[in-house]
Amino acid sequence: MSEQIKKEKSLEHIEFETKYRIDDSFLIQFKQIIDLLQEEKKFVYVEGPDLYFTYPDWWFKNNTQWDPSGTFVRYRRPSYGLDNGRRQVTWKYKKRDSKNNIQRKELNFDLMDKTTDNTVVEQLDSSGVKFNFSIVKNCHIYNFSDATIVFYTVYDTTYGKPKKTDSFVEIEINEEKVSEMSEEEAWAIISKYEKVLEPIGVNAQKRLRKSLFEMYKK
């Protein structure tokens, strides 16, 4: 029997996703493929900065179960009021013995409108994490009942002027349902959408091992 994906009933959830590098010229074809699917879906476009913060070495000495290569804090704030202006602080934890970034522990906190960016950054700084880098993501998001599929472009904005532009496709299992699935069932959903997106080069062989954090960390 395949292992059950466990989830604590709180703001915490298990993230189960795969990522693929892709040329940005495939965006229109990607959207056409998704639009032709008969399943009910919702589309959202979001863009804006993501600020990444890292823990100091002493923190990992006291929390040896977590891997520095995949444990961090992210502050996300959409531009132009997109996504209803929802801002979010996310703590992501990768186990030290994990072989990939497909399954990670994640804690999400949605912020109130009156919470300022300065307040968030000051609080993160006082908690011990330090700013490491920033990126801007332009995301075309399709939410299905079993997964979310995203085509997004990333710009590195850490030093001001945008550089290092990359594009990716991401398939993430619905976070509210993944805890009730076996790992085999979760992989079946990933494979289903890989087959759908195979015309633009999305397949199991193209799954990336590194997270965005590992790609852009300074």
Name every feature range the model reports, one short phrase each.
Residues 2-147, 202-218:
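N-terminal strand-loop-strand beta-hairpin
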Residues 20-22, 172-175:
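Short, structured patches in soluble enzyme cores that scaffold and shape functional sites
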Residues 175-215:
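Mixed-charge, glycine-accented linear interaction segment located at domain edges/termini
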